[in-house]
From Swiss-Prot:
It comes from Shigella flexneri. This is Ribosomal large subunit pseudouridine synthase E. Responsible for synthesis of pseudouridine from uracil-2457 in 23S ribosomal RNA. The active site is at D79. The keyword Isomerase applies.
Length: 217
């Protein structure tokens, strides 16, 4: 009886060890397979009111309705109420290069604001403003004409007839939550429409709103 119990325990331990070896081996194999995949980079011109993800439990519009490509994920966020360039990739190193603050990758935005910013307001944006999560890095900020490539937004923005609007070109080197909107509001000119045009070396470059294309890294 004693021999039977010892034999049974030994069999159980051996089986558990074999299970561990197989599980860890499978994990390494999956990781190697992922690392050996060729890099894919998708550029998408995100419309207004689309989430920068492929699923949503509440039924809102997602990337799945536009991009039939599996295994790629957005590098950084572009809020539901913002438009423009979204870079998706399966390469973690590329995602980090585009989004990590220490990389200081430039991101260009065209921003329609309420009112016409003064030179003092532009200088404040360039030098950095102090938000509730700390001071921002110096940024590029200039008053520009409405972009010639601009597409109509659906629905249109709500403008007040008594207040003019203007366009800014803003370049950030960090990526905080809703940073552009908070910066323009801080200097007294609320954002009405926000379009990301470029991230690092990637740009919209005549990509139509709601369309995507694959590029080489």
């Amino acid at each position: 009886m004693r021999q039977f119990i010892i034999s049974e325990n030994t069999m159980q331990k051996t089986s558990f060890r074999n299970h561990q070896v197989k599980r860890f081996s499978s994990q390494r194999s999956t990781r190697r397979k992922h690392e050996n995949q060729p890099t894919r980079v998708i550029l998408f011109n995100k419309p207004y009111d689309v989430l920068p993800q492929f699923t949503d439990e509440t039924g809102r519009k997602t990337l799945k309705e536009f991009i039939p490509v599996q295994g790629v994920y957005a590098a950084g966020r572009l809020d539901r109420d913002s438009e423009g360039l979204l870079v998706l990739t399966n390469n973690g190193a590329l995602q980090a290069r585009l989004t990590q603050p220490g990389k200081r990758t430039g991101k260009i935005y065209y921003v329609q604001v309420e009112g016409i910013p003064t030179q003092d307001a532009l200088e404040a944006l360039r030098n950095g403003v102090t938000l509730n999560d700390g001071p921002t890095l110096p940024a590029g900020a200039e008053l520009v004409d409405e972009p010639a490539w601009l597409w109509p937004r659906n629905p249109p923005i709500r403008e007040r007839k008594s207040i003019p609007t203007s366009w800014l070109k803003i370049t950030l080197y960090e990526g905080r939550n809703r940073q552009v909107r908070r910066m323009t509001a801080h200097v007294g000119f609320p954002t009405l429409r926000l379009i990301r045009y470029a991230m690092g070396d990637y740009s919209l470059d005549n990509l139509a709103n709601g369309e995507w294309r694959e590029v080489t890294d």
